[in-house]
């Protein structure tokens, strides 16, 4: 898969009409988990802790569970290809009520402070943010994570001043569920407020790493960029017909700031 649509080698300076997909003053709506934060370690360790706790709980009842812990590569492959959590639990050696017990532990674990600290900045994000800032393009984060969590993360990496606004959730458990209707509602609120503040969002794009991000952008007729560095694979994302698929935020910004020929 190519990250960016290949361009003609013809010098753009020799062509009369050229334009940019994103120009100075425009707004880029961007998801947080996946495009900006690498959450793979946190999600995998949440899985491991939930599996271990379930096994220990049954051991206290004198019941030995034949647990098979997946490797991180196996686990993340399943997550990227939208394998249900029930199937992941089944592959891990659980069945019946054991699966229910395992799944009930995840929401409480995934937002523990000790696990949140495992999130890492995706490669190339700092340069991508700087590129957008230097071009006068505003970054507005639309996420199902709590805004306070996002802001803490951005401060940790000295990136908070590069973001114009954060639209997040009040509920800490909303992000893991990643329901499309929630992302649509968040993006709708973000667009409405940006317009009230006097910013034109008609040329905006939506960038994200899940079907929820793509569907939200499409709901408001925004072109969408799907990133494969997060929790969904390229093959899965293409099924939702995004405008373009890129590897990460860095390649997405390159794509969005390249000149295109006006016909």
Residue ranges of predicted features:
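N-terminal helical cap/lid subdomain that shapes the substrate entry/recognition surface
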Residues: 16, 22-123
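Conserved Rossmann-like nucleotide-cofactor binding loop
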Residues: 35, 42, 147, 212, ...
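Short beta->alpha linker loops
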Residues: 42, 120-124, 145, 209, ...
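Conserved donor sugar-nucleotide recognition element shared by glycan-biosynthetic enzymes
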Residues: 43, 121, 180-183, 187, ...
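Short, acidic loop-to-helix structural element flanking the phosphoryl-transfer center
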Residues: 111-141, 147-151
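Surface-exposed amphipathic alpha-helices with a cationic face
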Residues: 126-133, 191, 214-218
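Substrate-recognition "cap/lid" segment bordering the active-site pocket of phosphatases
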Residues: 140, 147-205, 218-219, 236-238
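Acidic, Mg2+-coordinating phosphoryl-transfer loop and its flanking beta/alpha structural elements
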Residues: 206-245
